[in-house]
Amino acid sequence: MLDTVAQSPDIDALMNDIGRKARAASRPLAFASTESKNRALAAMADAILARKDHILAENAKDLKDVEGTDILASFVDRLTLTEKRVAEMAEGIRAIAALPDPVGEVFAAWDRPNGLKIERVRTPLGVIGVIFESRPNVTADAGALCLKAGNAVILRCGSDSRRSSQAILECLVEGLKAAGLPEHAIQLVPVTDRAAVGAMLRGLEGTIDVIVPRGGKSLVARVQSEARVPVFAHLEGLCHVYIDASADLDMAKAIVVNAKMRRTGICGSAETLLVDAKAAQTHLKPLLDGLTEAGCEIRASTEVLRLVPGLKTATEEDWSTEYLDAIISVTIVDGISGAIDHISRYSSNHTEAVIAEDPAVVERFFTEIDSAILLHNASTQFADGGEFGMGAEIGIATGKMHARGPVGVEQLTSFKYRVHGTGQIRP
């Protein structure tokens, strides 16, 4: 039976107990066999499919709670589970099981002149705290990824997704038990009190090794401000697409519409379109027509309005806004130099795309823009661990330390050195 608490008068005591259980579970996980971890993952996927109706019923209750509120449609989309999304959740877990086990991998080795043989070996991080909002699928993705990398995980979902996340957690715990692994290897914080987040950020008496926030700007800002443990920061998307004068127009139009409108509520959705001034006469209106026909609202700069009047005027705030909605800001820039300047000023360093046939333009874009993911002639919606072949992701890390870009199994490991000698002593 899983621990369930409606509310606790002593959040710190509750959370510290969760931390101790996670730390205890992390020890046997660190050297659990690949076979046992994969067996647990397979059982988790089976349980999710077997309990699909229950998961969807609990998700329907979560959705009912937000009915009539003023939340964005993109928020509701992230919260919503369907039969297809539940099936994809299970398939994602199976894909993680099929990945190579990173734990114990020797990824560097060398010999010293004194005869010492040195190896750098991947090891689990230990206990990972994941704080997320409105995305019940993160429960499955984070639980499975952390397990594959030999880590215990403490999950703190938003109150909006608590029923869905609990239903998914039950499937994950069933998988752990089926493989004989510690059931506290994956835990969901059973209270909605925000003090639980504060307790996690303080490290739960040293039991949490790293925090991964997955949510809006206010959550990530709080985590970065208050955390006393390392953070894999997943900032807002604010993705840009630059259309160079050398771009193929048909390709550019298809990519821009997909990058913005495939799913507007994900962090890989394009929020700003930059068009080379040399291509404005030929490319701008067809690009805007494609977006408008797809149901997207255009926020245009004065330069754009001179060529295509009648659109809503963009404000300074628009250039730094992650809409997560069917809205895009558009401006004209002075070639690749102007695009680099604009992106460098407003980007969150998440994902940017260049649509161009000129290799020199692509090379400058890739060299001079310092975002975690850069794409050439491809939609920003590919900014996803599953699309990168990682099975799934905990988030897109936009910082520069350790993990960057999609945080998958390999990024959830650290390393240690193994040094083999034959009796050497240091002179």
Curated annotation (Swiss-Prot):
Enzyme class: oxidoreductase
Tagged with keyword Hydrolase: no
Pfam families reported for this sequence: Aldedh
Catalytic activity: L-glutamate 5-semialdehyde + phosphate + NADP(+) = L-glutamyl 5-phosphate + NADPH + H(+)
Any GO molecular function: glutamate-5-semialdehyde dehydrogenase activity
Pathway listed: Amino-acid biosynthesis; L-proline biosynthesis; L-glutamate 5-semialdehyde from L-glutamate: step 2/2
Record localization: Cytoplasm
GO annotation terms (biological process): L-proline biosynthetic process
InterPro entries found in the cross-reference section: Ald_DH/histidinol_DH (IPR016161), Ald_DH_C (IPR016163), Ald_DH_N (IPR016162), Aldehyde_DH_dom (IPR015590), G-glutamylP_reductase_CS (IPR020593), Glu-5-SA_DH (IPR012134), GPR_dom (IPR000965)
PROSITE patterns per record: PROA
SUPFAM superfamilies named in the record: ALDH-like
The EC number(s) this enzyme carries: 1.2.1.41
Keywords assigned by UniProt, alphabetized: Amino-acid biosynthesis, Cytoplasm, NADP, Oxidoreductase, Proline biosynthesis
A cellular component annotation (GO) from this entry: cytoplasm
Entries under NCBIfam families matching the protein: PRK00197.1, proA
Function: Catalyzes the NADPH-dependent reduction of L-glutamate 5-phosphate into L-glutamate 5-semialdehyde and phosphate. The product spontaneously undergoes cyclization to form 1-pyrroline-5-carboxylate.
Similarity section: Belongs to the gamma-glutamyl phosphate reductase family.
Protein name: Gamma-glutamyl phosphate reductase
